[in-house]
A protein has these predicted regions:
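Conserved donor NDP-sugar-binding/catalytic core segment of glycosyltransferases
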Residues: 1-17
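Phosphate/oxyanion-binding loops and surfaces in catalytic or ligand/nucleic-acid-binding neighborhoods
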Residues: 8, 43, 86, 90, ...
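Short, solvent-exposed polar/charged micro-motifs at secondary-structure junctions
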Residues: 9-13, 75, 146-147
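Short secondary-structure boundary/hinge segments and terminal tails
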Residues: 9-11, 25, 102, 187
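Conserved nucleotide-sugar donor-binding catalytic segment
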Residues: 21-114
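C-terminal subregions of glycosyltransferases and related glycan-biosynthesis enzymes
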Residues: 85, 96-216
Length: 216
């Protein structure tokens, strides 16, 4: 099980944004495209689930692994997908924003190039587990991942990277536009606002959103 999360900054202040994920009827496609679990802090997992996905690398002599510890990023979605694709366990969320999730400038979430590389490595690693699934779903999931990274670049006020990633996800697949038109449109609008009007203008908008979120 898992819950939504309110986003906070380095100082612990609410940003006005939140992860409000899908809570029910979740399958591997939803996890691959949108990762409704959101972050590892939001999840509560039964021991039996970990027992079902345990593995031991050839060079590990002492203990079982559950997450792939060779990953520095994307280790959470790699684990969730192994659960979804190789076991009968179901994912279901609990209503409400029950955790806070810190977005750190210059942290892992901000390193969009490394995060994209880790995501692609995750896809390559798991492909043999369900080849037909990944062949069918990877293009759309990649577009969603690029859109997410575009939003991270926007939050970091990195106009060139935000614009580059926005072009990339639209070119990869238009399904995010059809499936989530509002979020897709606001992402594109923010990327081009940042590029055309500069970080100061967008920062003012983000500050207003943070103040509004703090009062809700």
């Amino acid at each position: 099980s898992f819950s939504g999360s309110a986003l906070i900054n380095d100082d612990g202040a609410f940003t006005g944004q939140a992860q409000r994920p899908r809570l029910r009827n979740i399958d591997a496609r939803h996890i691959f495209k949108r990762n409704p679990i959101g972050n590892g802090s939001a999840a509560v997992i039964r021991r039996e689930v970990f027992d079902a996905i345990a593995f031991r690398p050839d060079y590990e002599a002492h203990r079982e692994w559950y997450f792939d510890e060779t990953f520095r990023q994307s280790e959470d979605i790699e684990c969730w997908l192994r659960i979804a694709l190789s076991t009968d366990w179901e994912f279901e969320g609990v209503p409400g924003l029950l955790t806070n999730y810190r977005i750190s400038a210059g942290g892992l979430s901000s390193a969009t190039d490394r995060q994209l590389a880790a995501w692609e490595r995750m896809v390559g690693k798991l492909f043999s587990l369900a080849p037909e699934f990944f062949a069918s779903e990877a293009p759309v999931a990649r577009a969603y991942q690029l859109r997410y990274l575009s939003r991270r670049a926007i939050s970091d006020l990195d106009a060139p990277r935000a614009r580059e990633l926005s072009h990339a996800w639209v070119k990869t697949s238009l399904k995010p536009v059809r499936e989530e038109p509002l979020k897709s449109a606001t992402t594109l609008a923010a990327a081009y606002t940042l590029s055309l009007l500069g970080p100061r203008f967008l920062r003012q908008i983000m500050s207003l959103a943070a103040r509004k979120g703090a009062t809700q």
